[in-house]
UniProtKB/Swiss-Prot annotation:
Keywords: ATP-binding, Kinase, Membrane, Nucleotide-binding, Nucleus, Phosphoprotein, Receptor, Transducer, Transferase, Transmembrane, Transmembrane helix, Two-component regulatory system. Its main location: nucleus. This is Hybrid signal transduction histidine kinase K. Residues 98-162, 171-189, 279-331, 339-371, 498-511, 522-565 have a biased composition (Low complexity). The gene is dhkK.
């Protein structure tokens, strides 16, 4: 649908029309049309109707366009097929110049116009009507001939068409000669001007409108007419209030005649065209329709030129109307003007009567005369022929190939599908013309439509053939077999025959591919790729299942393998995780690929990241920021080419050169990032490049008015994300200073270089800047989302690795604890017998002196071995932060004497002088853990004796009166300095720090020469730091050797506390009947040692080999104290203790007696073992190898426990 002029709706109120006419008449004659009107088109773009406007300023290029808009109609139209060109005949353009094409014509010609002007208009109308009469006569003759041709056979049809064409040419020449009103020179000039305008508009139309976007006319198959009866007010559809819905109906009826005439041209090009007889009952309401072929276009153009020339002469004589004629609506006129309009109507009626006489149908003639009379009463000027008038109509919501006609009768039902549409006032029909739809497809949609249809048919046939071949195969489909075997977890294998058959099928499919259309080939390739991916997934699943079965067997065999290193566990975790991901997540990932897969932006970004980051010295913590820099550079490099092209085409060279310079600057930042590994320099270079380039471009595009400067807001964002808060503040101040310079320059009247015209800046630049900002933001957002996804993936992987490592560490710790507990128990058990028997031999009175010395040597060796075991246990406690410290009084001199007594034998063997020096300033009694201090001094003195071949080893203990910076003191504490000085081999200076690490020695060869495990100094350092002290070593300045020192803060003790310890430590014998003791021990040697130790203090004990024997003995007799071993056969000590407590609570022994005191006597010395002891109902705990004093203290505790229980029983009774 096309609207030639943007007519403003004329309301029924006459005041509005008068004011509009007055405003239009005040304009100039030559410019009133061009300034007020715009031409609107309905463009058809595939499935939608789009409005587009063309200013009437293009009309001003034509020299004869003043007052004549109808002349430029054909020049504005793009080349159309014959069915569209036939619309614009001489009747359409000539007769309607006074009816519907005037944009500023008034309803009353008397407003602001003289009577002379109206007379001129009447003359023009008469001339136009005469021309239309000639055309209608010729066209009606052609229609009758066309109807006769339809009844003849198809073989003679081509000859008839040629005769019809010759007749049309004769009619064109006759009508053009009769309708010409001007001289031959004027007509030739008009033709030349028409061709010039047509060429100008051809170039403009190709630039502004695509060739595919066609203008829909009423004959196009995809235009939907809305029913006029939707609204009784015709002003909604027409600009002229006097033209009602009848004009619409007449125009629609005329379209069918036009189609029938135009089909003759399509028959010449296509032999299989269908014909529709739509001539009957077409002119039932508004008279016979006019039909012109495409060959009449030249005649129409001549008639239009003549009419336009006449109209232009009228305008030059003083007519102020914007169009070539007035609307001639006499119903609303008054005075002389109204008389002139009535004359025009009479002339029109006469012309219509002449046209009706030329028609063959008398009934139609009577109907047309009646309709013309009604129109004359209403004041509308219509020709009897009712040509097709382009009018402004509301577009349809859903385009569909349909036409409307009022007559319900139709002869050719095989070509028409009638759909009744009921409206408020009358009924109308929608007729679908399938023939015209096919023609329109060939001419408008796609030239290769038939080729595609044939290709589709070939594809369907090929698919049917393949299905038949598949059905004839004797074996079942390999894919079905694969699915069945996958369900049974059996690997699938093709046979040789099946492989050959599959290869043959693939070759046939490849041959068929070459015959198919490329679009269809792409679809088939995509489907095959999907099938191949699914097959690969299935094969991988089968392979993974087989590998998992093998791995499970290997894992079952290697369950008991222990990992001594965390790296081994991490490697195992990575392998297991890859296998797990391939089993569970591989199918989902391939069926639903990630957003970043098959994405050009992300693939190119990953490629750049791999080039820059691989082999660089960038820290792992700064790789995320390095990726941000790469993302910004990638965004800049992707948009610089478009900016260069834009500025270069606009004629601005300097901004284009700056954009070119920005590319190597961005690339240089990436090179610096790769070589230096620092993120600071590349980020500053990138920010400087952006600021400099955007400042220059802003200067050449308007300065403070330029929208390019808005892009500088990205500079602080880049610096904030990469360099932090300080850098972002600095670059923010830089950007603000640039904005301020532009503003100040504008205040002082500085004229910026306006490289681009202001129109382009206002229209194109803003649009380009907005699109650039949006796309840059989008790319940065996508890159940032990629960073987040990568960070989440890495975090998830690290969390999983940490979880596995944590579990592995816990398992390793538990395994180590179990190992230590087991080894401690297994070592301490024989040590208990060894040290115990050596102690008994040493204390015996009947043993000779030599044998006593031998017993002492065995006892010392056992003590050394016990000390080594204790060191290992202490190490595990220190690493687990489970080491506890005692706070008991001790004498420092006694402690040093004990050390000298123990190590004197080793010193005498090497002829080394061992001495101890204790300062008198040290208090006699101190509070602290004497056992740990003794252990430290023993280790340091033993190392000095071991690495000294001759000379001396001296222990020096002194008080530091001044406050030491190494150790902080509290009130009542003293800094005690301990030094062990020797004349041995010494310690290198570079080894002073690492010598206190675990399993480290100053020289690795020392372990072979002197022995040792490397744990002594490490334990000493741990114990000193645990007691809030410091330890170190230095070489002797006056002699060979070195000095090990440590400082401890110790409190001063009292004499009362020391007396209590001495009283408790006295060796005294207990009465025989004071306590009854039972020893539960499965080792015979330990049984004898325990019995002999108890006999020394006057206690007789009985022995049980396991927990069941203990319960049997307790059923017969009550005992006050039980020394219970943990690990015993049949029933261990823990369960036996718990059973005893249950019996006591339930009174199963049927006697009233105090509860039994149970003392754990075991080689399990771990902290967890002690806790388990108390949880199972034991009262005390002694570790093996035990001493006599430990047994004495346990007996004393048992006596006190017995006394308390007896008192409680007496109170109850």
């Amino acid at each position: 649908m096309i609207e030639l002029n943007n007519h403003s709706k004329i309301n029924k109120n006459e005041n509005n029309t008068n004011t509009r006419n007055n405003s239009s008449n005040n304009n100039n004659n030559n410019n009133n049309i061009n300034k007020t009107n715009t031409n609107k088109y309905f463009e058809y773009n595939q499935n939608s109707i789009i409005y587009s406007s063309i200013p009437n300023s293009f009309l001003s290029h034509h020299p004869n366009s003043v007052g004549s808009q109808c002349l430029s109609l054909n020049s504005f139209l793009p080349p159309k097929p014959p069915i569209l060109l036939s619309i614009f005949n001489s009747d359409t353009i000539g007769n309607n110049n006074n009816n519907n094409y005037s944009s500023s014509s008034s309803r009353n010609n008397s407003s602001g116009c003289s009577s002379s002007n109206n007379n001129n208009n009447n003359n023009n109308n008469n001339n136009n009507n005469n021309n239309n009469n000639n055309n209608n006569n010729n066209n009606n003759c052609n229609i009758e001939q066309y109807k006769n041709n339809q009844k003849q056979p198809k073989q003679q049809q081509q000859q008839k068409d040629q005769t019809i064409a010759t007749q049309h040419r004769i009619s064109l020449s006759s009508s053009s000669s009769s309708s010409s009103l001007s001289s031959s020179s004027s007509s030739s000039s008009v033709k030349q001007s028409f061709q010039i305008v047509k060429r100008l508009f051809g170039s403009l139309s190709e630039y502004m409108f695509p060739q595919k976007d066609e203008i829909l006319y009423e004959t196009d198959p995809y235009y939907l007419y809305q029913d006029d009866t939707q609204s009784n007010d015709s002003n909604e559809f027409y600009d002229d209030t006097d033209i009602g819905s009848d004009i619409d109906e007449a125009n629609l009826n005329n379209t069918y005649n036009i189609q029938n005439c135009n089909k003759t041209l399509y028959n010449k090009q296509q032999q299989q065209a269908h014909f529709v007889n739509m001539n009957k009952n077409v002119n039932s309401n508004n008279g016979t329709g006019n039909s012109n072929q495409s060959n009449n276009v030249n005649k129409n153009q001549q008639n239009n030129n003549n009419n336009n020339n006449n109209n232009s002469h009228n305008n030059n004589n003083g007519n102020q109307n914007s169009s070539s004629s007035s609307s001639n609506s006499g119903a609303s006129g008054s005075g002389g003007n109204g008389n002139n309009n009535n004359n025009n109507n009479n002339n029109n009626n006469n012309n219509n009567n002449n046209n009706n006489n030329s028609n063959s149908n008398s009934n139609n003639n009577s109907k047309s005369n009646n309709n013309n009379k009604k129109e004359g009463k209403d004041g509308a000027t219509m020709n009897g022929s009712h040509p097709l008038i382009p009018f402004r109509k509301k577009p349809a919501q859903v385009p569909s190939p349909c036409f409307r006609m009022n007559s319900p009768n139709s002869d050719n039902d095989q070509y028409l599908d009638q759909l009744a549409l009921e409206n408020s006032s009358k009924k109308s029909l929608v007729v679908y013309n399938t023939d015209n739809l096919d023609q329109w497809k060939h001419s408008h949609l796609n030239e290769n439509f038939d080729i595609l249809q044939n290709d589709l048919i070939d594809i369907q046939q090929q698919q049917q053939q393949q299905q038949q071949q598949d059905n004839t195969l004797q074996y079942s489909s390999p894919i079905n077999k694969r699915q069945e075997q996958e369900q049974q977890h059996i690997p699938f294998q093709f046979t040789t025959e099946q492989q050959q058959q599959l290869q043959q099928q693939q070759q046939q499919q490849q041959q068929n591919k070459t015959k198919q259309h490329p679009i269809l080939l792409q679809r088939q390739q995509q489907q095959k790729q999907k099938q191949q991916q699914q097959q690969q997934i299935q094969q991988e699943q089968i392979g993974n299942n087989n590998s998992n079965n093998n791995n499970n067997i290997n894992n079952n065999n290697n369950i008991n393998n222990n990992y001594n290193n965390v790296n081994d566990l991490m490697n195992k975790f990575e392998i297991d995780q890859k296998q797990h991901d391939s089993q569970q997540n591989l199918v989902e990932e391939k069926r639903t690929p990630s957003f970043h897969e098959h994405n050009i932006i992300f693939n190119s970004f990953n490629f750049i990241c791999s080039i820059v980051l691989d082999g660089s010295n960038i820290k792992s913590t700064e790789k995320y920021k390095a990726k941000l820099i790469i993302g910004f550079c990638f965004t800049i490099l992707s948009f610089i080419p478009s900016w260069i092209i834009f500025f270069w085409l606009s004629g601005i060279n300097k901004p284009a050169v700056m954009a070119i310079i920005a590319m190597p600057m961005s690339i240089s930042s990436l090179v610096i990032l790769k070589r230096t590994g620092s993120i600071h320099y590349p980020c500053h270079i990138l920010c400087f490049t952006l600021c400099f380039a955007l400042t220059i471009n802003s200067y050449y595009t308007g300065g403070h008015q330029s929208t390019i400067r808005l892009l500088m807001s990205t500079v602080p964002i880049i610096s904030a994300l990469v360099l932090g808060r300080k850098a972002s503040i600095q670059w923010s101040l830089m950007v603000l200073s640039i904005y301020l310079l532009f503003f100040v320059a504008n205040l002082y009247g500085h004229e910026y270089v306006q490289g681009i015209p202001s129109i382009i800046i206002r229209s194109h630049m803003n649009f380009i800047i907005d699109v650039t900002i949006i796309i840059m933001t989008l790319i940065f957002t996508l890159c940032y989302q990629y960073f987040i996804d990568e960070a989440h993936r890495e975090t998830k992987l690290k969390n999983a690795q940490l979880t596995i490592a944590k579990d592995a560490a816990i398992e390793a710790y538990q395994a180590r604890q179990e190992f230590l507990a087991t080894m401690s128990h297994e070592i301490r058990t024989p040590l208990n017998g060894l040290i115990g028997m050596a102690t008994l031999l040493r204390d015996s009175h009947n043993l000779p002196p030599e044998e006593k010395t031998m017993a002492k040597a065995v006892k010392s060796c056992g003590d050394i071995l016990l000390r080594l075991v204790n060191d290992i246990l202490d190490l595990s406690k220190l690493e687990a932060n489970q080491m506890g410290l005692e706070h008991i009084p001790f004498r420092m001199r006694e402690l040093t004497q004990q050390i000298c007594h123990v190590l004197s034998g080793q010193a005498n063997e090497k002829n080394i002088h061992l001495s101890c020096e204790v300062s008198d300033k040290i208090p006699s009694i101190l509070l602290g853990d004497s056992g740990r201090i003794l252990q430290i001094l023993m280790n340091l003195t033993g190392n000095a004796l071991k690495f000294t071949q001759s000379g001396y080893v001296k222990i020096i203990i002194d008080l530091i009166e001044e406050e030491s910076e190494l150790v902080s003191l509290k009130k009542g504490e003293y800094n005690i300095s301990f030094r062990v000085k020797d004349t041995g081999i010494g310690v290198p200076v570079e080894s002073h720090q690492k010598i206190f690490e675990a399993f480290v020695q100053a020289d690795p060869s020392d372990s072979r020469k002197y022995g040792g495990s490397g744990l002594g100094l490490y334990l000493c350092a741990k114990l000193v730091r645990l007691m809030k002290g410091e330890i170190g070593v230095y070489n002797n300045p006056d002699c060979d050797g070195s000095t090990f020192w440590f400082i401890l803060p110790l409190e001063e003790g009292t004499d009362q506390s020391m007396q209590q310890m001495n009283n408790g430590a006295r060796h005294k014998a207990f009465p025989q009947d004071c306590v009854k003791v039972l020893i539960a021990e499965d080792n015979i040697i330990n049984q004898r040692v325990a019995v002999k130790f108890l006999e020394k203090i006057g206690i007789k004990a009985e022995v049980a080999g396991n927990g069941n024997e203990v319960l049997e003995i307790l059923e017969r007799q009550h005992y006050d104290l039980i020394f219970m071993d943990f690990q015993m056969p049949i029933l261990d000590g823990l369960r036996c203790s718990k059973t005893i407590r249950e019996f006591e609570q339930n009174h199963k022994w049927n006697r009233i007696c105090p509860s039994i005191f149970i003392c754990g006597l075991t080689a399990n010395t771990m902290s967890t073992d002690k806790k388990r002891c108390f949880d199972h109902g034991m009262n005390h705990f002694i570790s093996k190898p035990f001493q006599l004093e430990q047994l004495r203290s346990a007996i004393e505790m048992a006596i006190e426990h017995k006394q308390r229980n007896l008192m409680n029983l007496n109170i109850r009774n």
